[in-house]
Every structure is written in C-alpha cells, then in structure tokens.
Amino acid sequence: RLTLEEKRTFMNQRALAASPLLFGGDLVLSSDEDIALATCPEMLACNQDGITAKRIYGTAHVDVRQKFTDMEQRHGWIGIFNRKGCNYRFPLKISALKLPEKTDPRTLKDIWTGRPLEFLAADTLLFNFKAWESMLLRF
C-alpha cells in the first residue's frame, strides 16, 4: 500500500508528464482520499494542458520539473520530488526553480496541502519531505 505522500507523488508525476489518467478502481468502494486524489482540480489542470514538464534541476535525491502554460512563460507548474526512500531534509536555492522574473516565491503553495514554501535564507528554501514525498506548485 502506498502512503498518502506516495499517492500524491504518483499523481504529480502523471500531471507533469501530461499522461493519460485512468482510474482502475471500483468507484463505489474507493476511499474518499483516493477519489479526492483523482479529482483534484489543480492536478487535473496541470495534467490536461498537454504539456510535458522538463527537468530543470536534479541531484541524486532531488528532482525538480517545470512546465509553462503560456507562450510568454509567466505561468506554469513546478514539481519538487524527494527521490530518497526515507525522510529527507534539504536546502534548495530559489534560483533552481527558474521562476519567471516577477514571481514571488513567498506566494507559492503546494496544491495538495496549501503548505507554503519554507525559507532557510532570503535566497534558499528548506524542504523537509517524507520518503518519496513531493510538492506541486502553480505559478
């Protein structure tokens, strides 16, 4: 069984890849949690735009993907993934997110939890992820 964080990561991967979403479960017997994952409006908006994200930053244990939803590259999505099989606390320079010039990182929140980004310093973010956890941010 997958944890809630792993389920969200699975959905984030599909959304950023613009992969077809298929629900193979029994809708009547599915948990409210699983239905909420499959019907999250923000995740569906990311998935349904038909654009595949590109890797913009990576290390052995961190992967960052981004895609733009407009030609001017002002709006889009960023996925930040803990690829380590255990809890992982790591810093990340804001510049690694390659945000558009006028985007304030203090306004970004995870689509699933509403959790804002945590700052370690003015130019550095701090992530404290559970095993295989990720965030999907809309900018």
Predicted segment positions?
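Short, glycine-/Ser/Thr-/acidic-enriched flexible segments
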Residues: 21, 28, 83-86, 113, ...
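Carbohydrate-binding surface patches
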Residues: 14-17, 22, 58-99
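Aromatic/acidic polysaccharide-binding cleft in carbohydrate-active enzymes
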Residues: 1-49
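Hydrophobic, well-ordered secondary-structure elements that form the walls
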Residues: 16, 78, 108, 132, ...
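Membrane-interfacial catalytic/cofactor-binding modules of polytopic membrane enzymes
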Residues: 34, 38-75
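Active-site proximal loops enriched in glycine and acidic residues that flank catalytic Cys/His/Asp
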Residues: 80-82, 92-94, 110-112, 121, ...
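C-terminal beta-strand-rich structural cap/linker in extracellular carbohydrate-active enzymes
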Residues: 118-139
